[in-house]
Curated annotation (Swiss-Prot):
Gene Ontology BP term (one): tricarboxylic acid cycle
Subunit and partners: Interacts with the flavoprotein subunit within the SDH catalytic dimer.
Name of the protein this chain belongs to: Succinate dehydrogenase assembly factor 2, mitochondrial
Classification via SUPFAM superfamilies: YgfY-like (SSF109910)
Length: 153
C-alpha cells in the first residue's frame, strides 16, 4: 500500500515549535480561578487631577458623559449632565467624576436598577448622584432620549 505523507513547510514547523514553547507561559498569566477578579487586574486607574478649576472639571465631565462608547450609557449620562451639571456643587462634581470612572455597563445597570445583572457596590449604595441618575433614567416626562446639543450644557 502506498502511503502519501505531507511534510509541513519549515516556517510552519517553526511556528508550531514556538507555539508549543509559548502556550504554557501564556496560560500561566491567566487564572482559571472563578474567584479571581479579572476586572480589577485590567482596570486602568483614573488620573488624579490636582488644582483643576471647576469650569475645566465641568468641561471634562461633559466630554466624559458624552463619549463613553456605549450608546445607552452615552444617552443617559449626557442627558443627565445637560440637565444637572451646571447646578452641581464641587462635592457633587467629584462624586459624579468618580462614578464616571466605573465601567460603562455597570453604570448602565445601576442607573436602570438592574441589580441582578450588576449589583451596586457598597461605595455607591448611598450615593446622591446615583439616586439622581436613577430618577433621571425613569424618564417621567416620557421624552425620547437623544444626545443633547452642546449649547444645553
Amino acid at each position: 500500500m502506498l502511503r502519501i505523507t505531507y511534510k509541513l513547510p519549515i516556517a510552519l514547523r517553526q511556528q508550531a515549535f514556538v507555539a508549543r514553547k509559548l502556550v504554557p507561559t501564556i496560560k500561566a498569566n491567566y487564572s482559571t480561578n472563578s474567584d479571581d477578579d479579572v476586572v480589577s487586574r485590567i482596570k486602568v486607574h483614573p488620573i488624579k487631577r490636582i488644582n483643576e478649576s471647576i469650569d475645566k472639571k465641568r468641561a471634562r465631565l461633559i466630554y466624559q458623559s458624552r463619549k463613553r462608547g456605549i450608546l445607552e450609557t452615552d444617552l443617559l449620562l449626557s442627558g443627565f449632565a445637560a440637565k444637572h451639571l451646571r447646578s452641581m456643587t464641587n462635592e457633587e462634581l467629584d462624586e459624579y467624576d468618580a462614578l464616571l470612572n466605573e465601567l460603562d455597563w455597570d453604570i448602565y445597570y445601576w442607573v436602570t436598577k438592574n441589580y441582578k445583572t450588576s449589583p451596586v457596590p457598597e461605595r455607591w449604595k448611598n450615593s446622591e448622584i446615583l439616586k439622581k441618575l436613577q430618577d433621571f433614567s425613569e424618564n417621567k416626562e416620557k421624552k425620547i432620549l437623544r444626545m443633547p446639543d452642546l449649547e444645553n450644557y
